[in-house]
Regions:
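An alpha-beta-alpha
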Residues: 55, 158-223, 246, 339
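Short, low-complexity disordered leader/linker segments with a strong preference
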Residues: 1-48, 79, 400-403
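Hydrophobic alpha-helical segments within soluble ligand-binding/sensing domains
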Residues: 102, 165-190, 202-204, 232-233, ...
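Segments of small-molecule ligand-sensing domains
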Residues: 320-329, 340-393
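Extracellular/periplasmic bilobed ligand-binding domains
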Residues: 205-298
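Beta-alpha junction/loop-to-helix N-cap segments that form part of ligand/metal-binding clefts
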Residues: 64-66, 80-154, 225-230, 257, ...
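Extracellular/periplasmic periplasmic-binding protein-like sensory domains
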Residues: 260-333, 387-401
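Extracytoplasmic "Venus flytrap"
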Residues: 40-69, 93-100, 122-123, 193-202, ...
Length: 403
């Protein structure tokens, strides 16, 4: 596990004035107990925040891209004076895209490095693996992209007191895409091809199916694959022989890129739809530009958005990385700003006080949209539907949170 710290960062493009992004305080429930890490972290003159991300392994792109956003936010916050006069120090560790390693990383960050909060992992399974450590030590963990339905609640439906996410749940994505099929694409029938080894893909497929059926549509069939598969000929041969308006293909970029490429090579021309797992630079490399047409996916952010907050973020990101930001960059950026905002409102208090401030966040002006944290510690915000042309974002439709 490689440790990298960032502190006393030099001035960056687009200074982020912390007071200007502070969410208003609501009536969140304060977790009980005492914080064991606050004294240690505050005594050192910096505020330690841990990063538990997938920096190697099968979904490394998500972690790497999220970290870029976090680091940009840290640059801006530190250049603007830090949080209550203290600089942010990021301690970054690699969970290797592995659930057991995620638990190990969370344990080290919380019990040895004494961080006040942990951002990441990016994916739901790895994020859930870090939760027991967080709750036991009363240190908040935050993910910008863990979208599984059961991330912020336990098996009995009780809210996890130290667990938060700045993204919406999978059911929101599946529902939005099914409505998009009916209302925008004017489709009624769909074939589902899903990663049966992934709770993420299974959950998305279920919410899409339920919503499409409720709208009078139908699912003509379901096919499955598992993470790591590379030969999809059997599935796609069946798909080519069937009749449907769209293919719903929820999954991660590794397999999705290969499936879309193979489908187009077989002559399957139907629109292919998915979710935020598509948003990786690797999708284009795997699928190829010519295959990535008539492809749509739900997402948290679009670089086509002309909102001033988004435009400013894009300019700052390009100045630092010389690249167009994607949703994982934006979600990492928002996640650190969300924590910084709560630390400001908690007057630097950590543990239960920080968790309460996070839970009380209202109308936070995120790059991924203005959001409020609900009673289950989910972010309520708009959703974007992105259309690709030659693998590049060409259209975006904003669906209001109330829809």
């Amino acid at each position: 596990m490689k440790r990298i710290t960032i502190g006393l960062v030099a001035a960056a493009t687009g200074l982020f004035m912390l007071a200007g992004c502070t969410g208003t305080t609501g009536g969140g429930t304060t977790p009980t107990g005492t914080d064991s890490s606050a004294a240690a972290t505050n005594a050192g003159g910096t505020i330690k925040i841990g990063l538990n991300y997938e920096l190697s392994g099968n979904v490394a792109s998500y972690g790497e891209e999220s970290v870029k956003g976090v680091e940009l936010a840290a640059d801006e916050i530190n250049a603007a004076g830090g949080i209550n006069g203290k600089q942010i120090e990021l301690i970054k560790l690699d969970n290797k895209s592995d659930e057991a390693e995620s638990t190990t990383v969370a344990t080290k960050l919380i019990t040895q490095d004494k961080v006040v909060a942990v951002i990441g992992p990016a994916t739901s399974g790895r994020f859930k693996a870090s939760i027991p450590v967080a709750n036991a030590n009363k240190v908040p963990v935050i993910s910008g992209s863990a979208t599984a339905e059961d991330v912020t609640v336990d098996a009995q439906g009780n809210v996890q007191p130290y667990v938060f996410r700045t993204c919406f749940a999978d059911s929101v994505q599946g529902t939005a895409m099914a409505n998009f099929v009916v209302n925008e694409l004017k489709g009624k029938t769909a074939l589902i091809i899903k990663d049966t080894s992934s709770d993420y893909a299974v959950g998305l497929a279920q919410s899409f199916s339920d919503t499409l059926k409720a709208a009078g549509g139908s699912i003509v069939g379901e096919e499955g694959y598992v993470q790591g598969d590379t030969d999809f000929n059997s599935i796609l041969t069946k798909a080519k022989a069937m009749t449907y308006d769209v293919i719903y293909l929820p999954g991660y970029y590794n397999e999705v890129g290969l499936i879309i490429k193979a489908a187009r090579e077989l002559g399957i021309t139907a629109p292919i739809l998915g979710a935020d797992g598509y948003d990786s630079p690797t999708l284009l490399a795997l699928g190829g530009a010519s295959a990535l047409n008539d492809v749509y996916f739900t997402n948290h952010y679009s670089s086509l958005d002309q909102d001033p907050t988004v435009v400013k973020f894009i300019a700052a990101f390009k100045a630092k990385y010389n690249a167009e930001p994607n949703a994982f960059n934006a979600m990492g950026y928002d996640s650190l700003r969300f924590v910084a905002d709560a630390l400001t409102r908690s007057d630097g208090q950590t543990g239960p006080a920080l968790a309460d401030a996070l839970a009380s966040t209202k109308d936070f002006p995120g790059v991924t949209g203005k959001f409020t944290i609900d009673a289950k510690h989910n972010a309520i915000k708009d959703i974007m539907i992105i259309g690709l042309k030659d693998g590049v974002q060409s259209t975006s439709v904003r669906i209001p949170a109330s829809s």
